[in-house]
Curated annotation (Swiss-Prot):
This is 1-deoxy-D-xylulose 5-phosphate reductoisomerase. The gene is dxr. One of its GO terms (molecular function) is 1-deoxy-D-xylulose-5-phosphate reductoisomerase activity. It comes from Pseudomonas fluorescens (strain ATCC BAA-477 / NRRL B-23932 / Pf-5). The lineage of its organism: Bacteria, Pseudomonadati, Pseudomonadota, Gammaproteobacteria, Pseudomonadales. GO terms for biological process: isopentenyl diphosphate biosynthetic process, methylerythritol 4-phosphate pathway involved in terpenoid biosynthetic process. Belongs to the DXR family.
Length: 396
């Protein structure tokens, strides 16, 4: 009998966290929740703690921690509440933990994810920003600690499944010619360009295929999400940006493909449900039931493909430029995007201005080497300052 694995879920109240807990609950003989973390949805975090009875919960502030601790005691639970980034790093690196779901959105997830890496944990990486920001430093830490890094993004998990087991030897050595990264095209794939000036946050968050959080939904609408995934794919699979091609596939059934030098193209298909890649990574190299319905090809009937329109999706072009520039450029791209998307969700800017802000930040700030984590955070901070200056200068 295999020992029950202890799982920390960073970002438990988000869509990835909830899907992870759904899969875990289906396999109580295999997995137990060690820690859950939340940011603003404290009532939801309390409910999850009552259901899963973790040893630890983490919230950002002491006042929230005190309230949650009192509520947990009232519910008869022994769950201990920790606070802030230090608490996140503690539950990510605790000796008892076997695997960490890294699902905190944005730059805030970098330090706790790195703490899990440095502790040699099995990392289920949903926080693409951590790898986008720190790139080489992150992968060096993985290599040094012996941590197992498994991608959760449906596209990267699909690529992982289509790659040979020894892909780390180098793509050319294992016969891989290119990676084909699929994208749905989001809710604005066919919206007339002149109407994009007037789209609302609600429209941007109404993804046709996937159920996601607000920030990643906007990123999907702008295809910045695909740009970040392009950068992530380069690091995960040691690929050059020129080896990663983005293909718009509206049905979101083929999650990505790998093109081999002999003419073979391997693809991974499935219903658009994040429980599939989560279950794949949780159980790897085994397979477990995810709760996802079988794929009905007859109901789908057709699969369409087209090239992305860079006039419609300038964020994708900016992300590829950052990938090619390397060094501090991806961290600046990510930071500027986080500020811009937040401003759009707050109705302070129009949708096309997301790309305008990012473009200005990348144009104004020179690319510098990032040989240590402090340099990554310095680039992140500088980009945020420049993005805020754009907002102030334009009266937003």
């Amino acid at each position: 009998m295999t020992a029950v694995q202890q799982i920390t879920v960073l970002g438990a109240t988000g869509s990835i966290g909830l899907s992870t807990l759904d899969v875990i609950a289906r396999h109580p003989d295999r997995y137990q929740v060690f820690a859950l973390t939340g940011f603003t949805r404290l009532a939801e975090l309390l409910a999850l703690c009552v259901k899963h009875e973790p040893r630890f919960a983490v919230v950002p502030e002491a006042a929230a921690a005190s309230r949650l601790q009192q509520d947990l005691r009232g519910a008869g639970l022994a769950t201990q509440v920790l606070v802030g980034e230090q608490g996140l790093c503690e539950v990510a690196s605790a000796p008892e933990v076997d695997a960490v779901m890294a699902a905190i959105v944005g730059a805030a997830g970098l330090r706790p994810t790195l703490a899990a890496v440095e502790a040699g944990k099995k990392i289920l990486l949903a926080n693409k920003e951590a790898l986008v920001m720190s790139g080489a430093l992150f992968m060096q830490a993985v290599g040094k600690s012996g941590s197992v890094l498994l991608p959760i993004d449906s596209e990267h998990n699909a690529i992982f499944q289509c790659m040979p087991a020894d892909f780390s030897r180098g793509l050319s050595r294992v016969g891989v010619r290119r990676i084909l990264l699929t994208a749905s095209g989001g809710p604005f794939r066919q919206t007339p360009l002149e109407e994009l000036e007037h789209v609302s946050p609600e429209q941007a968050c109404a993804h046709p295929n996937w159920s996601m959080g607000r920030k990643i939904s906007v990123d999907s609408a702008s295809m910045m999400n695909k740009g970040l995934e392009l950068i992530e794919a380069c690091w995960l699979f040691d690929a050059r940006p020129s080896q990663v091609e983005v293909v718009v596939h509206p049905q979101s059934v083929i999650h990505s493909l790998v093109d081999y030098v002999d003419g073979s193209v391997l693809a991974q298909l499935g219903n658009p449900d994040m429980r599939t890649p989560i279950a794949n990574a949780l159980a790897w190299p085994e397979r477990i039931d995810s709760g996802v319905a079988p794929l009905d090809l007859f109901a789908i009937a057709r699969l369409d493909f087209q090239a992305p329109d860079e006039q419609r999706f300038p964020c994708l072009r900016l992300a590829r430029q950052a990938a090619e520039a390397g060094n501090s450029a991806p961290a600046m791209l990510n930071a500027a995007n986080e500020v811009a998307v937040s401003a759009f969700l707050e109705r302070r800017i129009r949708y096309p201005e997301i790309a305008s802000i990012i473009d200005e930040v990348l144009t104004r700030e020179p690319v510098v080497a990032v040989n240590e984590l402090d340099a990554v955070f310095a680039a992140d901070a500088r980009a945020r300052v420049l993005a805020q200056q754009w907002l102030q200068r334009n009266g937003r």
